[in-house]
Amino acid sequence: YSGNDASSPYEANYLEDICEEISEIEENKRPQILFRRCPVDKSNRFDKVLEKYKGLIFSIDPDWRIDKENRDSFATIYPTLNDVKLLVNTVFHSDLVLNLGSTMAHDFAVLNKPCFYLNYNPVKNSIFKVEDVYSFQHFNSLKDIDAVGFINHKNDIKKNIYDTLFSSKVIGKDRINWLNRIVLHPLEKNSKNLIEEIE
């Protein structure tokens, strides 16, 4: 599970839902959960869930550096080379990723691994609505393709994960097509292209 920043207030609720559902899978087939929080989220909002499901879930904190005074801004925080290795290894050793509209879907697509987007409101009558997240402009790039799976209810988590791991069901068969729409290819030239643009 890859978390979002504090502007997404129910990330801990989603994480607990995932843990509850996965804990119901029979033990010899139960997957472990790797949790990667958003690099700018230094809060303790996940601590209770991590403690409650110790042994099922393992937290891997991003290795980002903080610069200047504004500790909660992406403008002053940046990844280390070690974090790039950590992220690649996380993706390599994971079977799938779940999150709320995160670009981690693309990190997993690079290695042709599926993503599920959580698509339900864990708290009723909240001003924060999942429908608002998926109405952002950049999700228009998902139109007409099957790039991710959508989990529309907490009770769908277990079945979707189980089916992805233990059946021939393919989730997000167009994930590479979506990656090609979003990210300039070839991927191995992106760092060079970025440096040239900055210079």
Per-range role (PLM):
Residues 58-83, 129-138, 142:
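Charged, glycine/proline-rich intrinsically disordered loops and linkers
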Residues 11-18, 83, 90, 101, ...:
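Amphipathic coiled-coil/heptad-repeat helices and related helical stalk/stem segments
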Residues 32-33, 93-96, 145-148:
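Short active-site oxyanion
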Residues 75-83, 88-102:
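Acidic donor-binding loop of glycosyltransferase active sites
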Residues 187-199:
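C-terminal alpha-helical cap of glycosyltransferases
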Residues 103-183:
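Catalytic binding pocket for nucleotide-activated donors in carbohydrate/polymer assembly enzymes
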Residues 1-2, 36-37, 98-101, 118:
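Short His-Asn-centered micro-motif
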Residues 1-76, 151:
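Conserved catalytic-core segment of nucleotide-activated headgroup transferases in glycan assembly
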